[in-house]
Amino acid sequence: MPLFPALKGRGNKQSLAKAETNEMRKADAPSVGRYEILDEYNIIPQTVSVEISWNPNTMEAMYVVNEPVMSSEELDLLKRITKNMEQIVKNTKNFPDDLSTVTIDKVIDAYLKGRKYKLNRRTTDKIRYYVKRNYEGFGPLEPVVRDPLVEDVSCNGVGVPVFVEHKIHGSLKTNIVFDSEKELDSYVVRLAQMCGKEVSMNEPIIDGTFPQGHRIQLTYGNEIATKGSAFTFRLFRETPFTPIELIKYGTATSELVAYLWLMVENLKSAIIAGVPGVGKTSTINAVLMFLPSNTKVFSIEETREINILHQNWVATSTRESIYSSASRDEKNPPIGMFELVKMAMRQRPTYIVLGEIRGRESYSLFQAISTGHTAYSTIHADSMETLVNRLESNPLNIPRVLISGLNVVIFNKFVRVGSRNLRKLMEVDEIVGTDTDSGEILYNKVFSYDFSQNRQKFSGYSKILNEIRDTKQMTQEEFDSEFQRRIELLEHLVTNNITDYTNITRIINIYYKDPETALKMASGK
C-alpha cells in the first residue's frame, strides 16, 4: 500500500482532476437512447465503470469512463481534505512519529472523526476514491490505468480527447479531456515525478518507467508538440494475457494454440512479428505460459513487459548510464541488450527471451539459436519478405545461414471485422531451409487466416509437427490423438472461463505429468 510520505508536494500541483466537473463529463458520455452499448464492465465495483459505445452518426466507438458524481457538499468536503492532508497528520496525536505506516485511509478517518462527520457509506467511498485517485493514483486517468483491457494511453494536447488502445475494441477516443494548458502541464510534470524524473522547458522530452512497470514517453510545453504537452504510456500488466484469452477473444483458434503449445514444449524457436500495437507482447506472454516448469528461462528487455509464472527464471533489463556521454563514469557504464544476451548464453538457459529484435544483440541471439538454444522474440515486420529484409539489413546484419536456423514466425495483424479492427494471428510460417540455387529462405505456411470463415485454417502439413511425432516415436494416429487431447483441454478452459494465469499455468504443468488429471481439472470434474 502506498505510503504517506510519497504524497508530499502533490496535493496542490494535481488538481481534483475535474471531480468538480464530473457532471459535465458524464453529460458528454453517450446515452443509451442515442448510442449502442458495445461493451460495459466495472473497474471498481459500485464505484467506477466503463462503457464502450458506438456512435452511428460519427461511425466510431468511444471509451466512456463513469465515475461517482459528487454533490456540492461532498465536493466541498473533498476539497478541504485534499487541501489539508499533511496538516491533518501533524494535528493528529495518534499518528506515530514514523509516517511510513500512515495510509490515506487513516488520514481520511482521522479528519472525519476529528470533526465528528457522520457520513453514509456511499459518500465515504466517494471521498476515499477521489482522494486516492488524485494523491496516490493517476488522477483522471486512474480508471483507464486500472482497466486490464487497456494497453496504451495517449494524450495529444489541450482540448483533445485522450485515446486508449483496447485489447478487444482497438483504438478508442475517451470522454477524458484536459481543458487548459495549465492543467495538462501540471499533470505531465506529475507523471514525470512519478517516474523519478524532472521535466522542464530545458529538458522537454522524457522517457520513464513508473514503479508499477508502466512505460511513458512525454513532452512538455508547446515548443515540441504544437498542441501543448503530450504523453503516451504503455501499461504493464501484473496479470499477463493468456493462451485461453487468445482463443476466447478470437485472436487464434484452439487448434493453432495447441500447435504453439507443442512448439514451446519441444524447444522450437520463434519470432512474433507485426506492426506496432498489434499485440506482439500479449502473444509472446501467452505463448510463454506453455514453458515446462523444469526448464530455465532467461529474459532480456529494455523495459519490463515479459511476465511469466516460472520459478527458474532470470529476468533482466538494461541499465542506462546516470551520466551524460561527456562525463560518464567508467565505473558505472550502461548495460545494454548485447551484454545481457552474452550473459544469457553463459548461463545455459533452456529458453532465451529477447523483448524485441532491433540492435546488434540480435546477431548474438541468432548465434545462440544456431548452437542449440531455444529463443523467442518480437520484431516489427508484416510479412516473411519484410522480416528477412530487416534481419539482413543494418543494424542487424544477420546472414541467411543463421536466419534459416529459426523454426517459426508468427504474424500478428489487424483484421477489419464489421466496424472494428481486431487482432488476429494472421499467419504462422515454418522456415524449412534455403534454396541451394538462389539462397532464398524457404518457408511453409502452416496456418493462414480465412476471411470467409473469420478463423485460421491449417494447411495440412507441418514440418515441425512431423519432427515432433518422429522424435517421440509415435504413429500418426497416436500423434493426432495427443494433438486433439490438447485442443480438448484448451476448449474446456475456454468453456469454463478459466482465464486466470496462475490456474492455467498450474493445469498446463500438471498436463506434462498427468494429462488425464489436467483434463478433469479443465473440464471441472
Positions of PLM-derived features:
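P-loop NTP-binding catalytic core
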Residues: 155-269, 311
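Conserved lysine of the Walker
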Residues: 280
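Terminal-proximal interaction/regulatory segments of ATP-powered molecular machines
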Residues: 485-525
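N-terminal accessory targeting/assembly segments
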Residues: 1-195, 199
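Switch/coupling sub-region of P-loop NTPases
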Residues: 259-262, 266-276, 288-415
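Conserved P-loop NTPase
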Residues: 408-494
